[in-house]
């Protein structure tokens, strides 16, 4: 296909250069200086001063060598180290603590509530977990209304609590005091498993009075205002952490990285506690576990221009027109939120250069955000020679003047842009795998872009094999509903750890009691033996010292106690 496209592109470049020369000559013949009047064509169709562009030049910009990808991996790894040391002030990869100390081990059981606020949707779920069985789930879905997304924090959390209460009341469990796990998929500075301060809103939220506040406290205050439900919020997690935990549950307890590739991208992995300087410096309670899941927040990589060498001119155009220019750079490169718009900008450039559609675009094609990312998946699903979806999409864009080679070129643009995203995502995953460095590593992946793009998973796996260090083995596990299942499973892990810690405390108390009893018996025996042999002592002021730790004072012997030492007198 690429050979045909190359031939087609060369022919078009030659033909279009002749056409541009004819138009230019016509312009001078008529004495017209206004480009918009050339041959009756509007400015949106082409400009004489456009730099040369072809499919080859586009592909050259989006093609990243493994050398470039490894350079990016090295920069990411250094930023991860800086994030562990100093957090978001020190690095564009924040490396935020989750305070989740373990993965599920298969013994979790109980009934739990999970809430998932991600994007513009809210889900409330009731999950029954039993060892060795599939999770049983009942759920309620709703869309967050625009007034809540752009209103006050009190309005937003009151709406969330309203949905929770209605679900619990419908199930008749509003007074059962069930534990709640809350998946809150926005960057938070976490201070414990149930305390997290929102750093910034993403995904279209502009709710006031939440940034800088403790999200769990806001939810609990809203629950208290209602007063008609009884629950306990025990964990607040990120969707990436939930994906990692859900993947571990599916794979029998093993998952080394959790990855989201949806509208944006993020990852989590298990890190040694000794390396988590920033996260533990703000902890509100002692953390007594050897490991912790880290929420990398790698979507911000590049926000300080440290990754400019992987940006194309099209990425820069899309970023400059975005809602938050210069923010979440890696999100925009890998996730689906901007992928369609990048393709559209490329198509617009090719059209204006008369490489595509004979230079005749449409108002829709030249309108920002008119080419959603789902178009890419639909175009690439077309079977060879059919192009049913491609024709439908061109119709939706108001383009009816296209050739077979136009459809081939459109498809190839979708390939080069989305494959670049897959390669960057693979490089980021490989960076973490090379840091974790364990055998037979499991990567749990969730997200709409990864799931619904027909080739994305294959491209990620293919590139990973080239970038992961030799000798390291890995497996990709596509995980369904990590944000929902993960929240319930983490709540179950908390319950399991609570039981385990209580049991350990009881065992320690029993061991201490047994030790005390043994010491007491030894002292009593020594006292009895000493009293029975007092006549053997010739010197009335001789004393026997028995070291007694943690034993009560006895009144049944003759002697003194000083600094924990019993002095038994031999006086008659």
From Swiss-Prot:
The UniProt record lists the keyword Kinase: yes
Chain residues that bind substrate: 185-186, 202-203, 238-239, 266, 297, 331
Sites where the protein binds D-glucose 6-phosphate: 116-120, 185, 239, 263, 446-448, 483
Regulation of its function: Activated by glucose-6-phosphate. Inhibited by N-acetylglucosamine, glucosamine, mannoheptulose and ADP.
GO cellular component assignments: cytosol; mitochondrion
Transmembrane residue ranges: none
Catalytic activity line of the entry: a D-hexose + ATP = a D-hexose 6-phosphate + ADP + H(+); D-mannose + ATP = D-mannose 6-phosphate + ADP + H(+); D-fructose + ATP = D-fructose 6-phosphate + ADP + H(+); D-glucose + ATP = D-glucose 6-phosphate + ADP + H(+)
Binding site for ATP: 116-121, 263, 336-337, 373-377, 448-452
InterPro entries: ATPase_NBD (IPR043129), Hexokinase (IPR001312), Hexokinase_C (IPR022673), Hexokinase_N (IPR022672)
One of the GO BP terms on file: intracellular glucose homeostasis
Region (Hexokinase small subdomain): 105-237
Gene Ontology molecular functions: ATP binding; D-glucose binding; fructokinase activity; glucokinase activity; mannokinase activity
EC number in record: 2.7.1.1
Domain Hexokinase, residue spans: 49-492
First-tier enzyme category under EC: transferase
Pfam family, one: Hexokinase_1
Pathway annotation from the record: Carbohydrate metabolism; hexose metabolism; Carbohydrate degradation; glycolysis; D-glyceraldehyde 3-phosphate and glycerone phosphate from D-glucose: step 1/4
Keywords for the protein's UniProt record, in alphabetical order: ATP-binding, Glycolysis, Kinase, Nucleotide-binding, Transferase
Biological role stated in the UniProt entry: Active against glucose, fructose, mannose, maltose and galactose.
Protein's recorded name: Hexokinase
Organism: Brugia malayi
Lineage, uppermost ranks: Eukaryota, Metazoa, Ecdysozoa, Nematoda, Chromadorea
């Amino acid at each position: 296909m690429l050979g045909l496209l190359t031939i087609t592109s060369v022919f078009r470049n030659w033909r279009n250069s002749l056409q541009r020369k004819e138009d230019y000559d016509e312009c001078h013949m008529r004495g017209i200086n206004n480009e918009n009047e050339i041959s009756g064509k509007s400015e949106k169709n082409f400009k004489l001063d456009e730099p040369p562009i072809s499919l080859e030049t586009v592909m050259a910009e989006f093609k990243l060598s493994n050398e470039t990808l490894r350079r990016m991996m090295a920069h990411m790894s250094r930023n991860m180290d800086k994030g562990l040391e100093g957090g978001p002030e020190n690095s564009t990869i924040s490396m935020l603590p989750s305070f989740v100390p373990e993965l599920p081990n298969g013994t979790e059981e109980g009934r739990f509530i999970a809430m998932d606020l991600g994007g513009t949707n809210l889900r409330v779920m009731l999950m029954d977990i039993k060892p060795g069985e599939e999770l049983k789930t009942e759920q309620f879905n709703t869309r967050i209304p625009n007034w809540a997304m752009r209103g006050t924090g009190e309005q937003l959390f009151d709406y969330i609590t309203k949905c929770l209460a209605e679900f619990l009341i419908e199930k008749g469990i509003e007074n059962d005091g069930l534990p709640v796990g809350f998946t809150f998929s926005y960057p938070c500075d976490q201070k414990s498993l149930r305390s997290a301060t929102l750093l910034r809103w993403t995904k279209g939220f502009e709710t006031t009075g939440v940034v800088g506040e403790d999200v769990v406290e806001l939810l609990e205050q809203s629950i208290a205002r209602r007063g008609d439900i009884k629950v306990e919020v025990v964990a607040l997690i990120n969707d990436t952490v939930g994906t990692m935990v859900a993947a571990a549950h599916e794979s029998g307890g093993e998952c080394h990285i959790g990855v989201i590739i949806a509208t944006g991208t993020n990852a989590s992995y298990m890190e040694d506690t000794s390396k988590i300087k920033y996260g533990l410096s703000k902890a509100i309670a002692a953390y007594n576990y050897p490991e912790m899941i880290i929420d990398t927040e790698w979507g911000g990589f590049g926000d300080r221009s440290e990754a400019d060498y992987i940006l194309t001119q099209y990425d820069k155009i899309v970023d400059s027109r975005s809602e938050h220019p210069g923010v979440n750079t890696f999100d925009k490169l890998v996730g689906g939120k901007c992928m369609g718009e990048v393709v559209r900008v490329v198509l617009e450039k090719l059209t204006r250069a008369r490489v595509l559609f004979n230079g005749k675009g449409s108002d829709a094609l030249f309108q920002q955000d008119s080419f959603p990312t789902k178009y890419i998946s639909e175009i690439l699903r077309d079977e060879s020679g059919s192009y049913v979806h491609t024709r439908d999409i061109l119709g939706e864009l108001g383009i009816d003047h296209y050739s077979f080679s136009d459809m081939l070129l459109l498809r190839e643009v979708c390939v080069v842009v989305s494959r670049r995203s897959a390669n960057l995502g693979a490089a980021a995953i490989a960076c973490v795998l090379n840091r974790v460095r364990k055998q037979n590593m499991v990567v749990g992946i969730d997200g709409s872009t990864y799931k619904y793009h027909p080739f994305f998973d294959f491209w990620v796996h293919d590139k990973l094999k080239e970038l992961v260090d030799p000798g390291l083995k890995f497996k990709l596990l596509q995980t369904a509903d990590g944000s929902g299942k993960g929240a319930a499973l983490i709540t179950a892990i908390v319950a399991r750890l609570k039981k385990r810690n209580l049991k350990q405390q009881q065992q320690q108390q029993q061991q201490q009691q047994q030790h005390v009893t043994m010491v007491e018996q030894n002292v009593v025996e020594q006292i009895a033996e000493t009293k029975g042999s007092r006549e053997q002592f010739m010197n009335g002021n001789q004393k026997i010292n028995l070291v007694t730790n943690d034993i009560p004072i006895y009144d049944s012997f003759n002697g003194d106690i000083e600094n924990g030492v019993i002095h038994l007198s031999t006086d008659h």
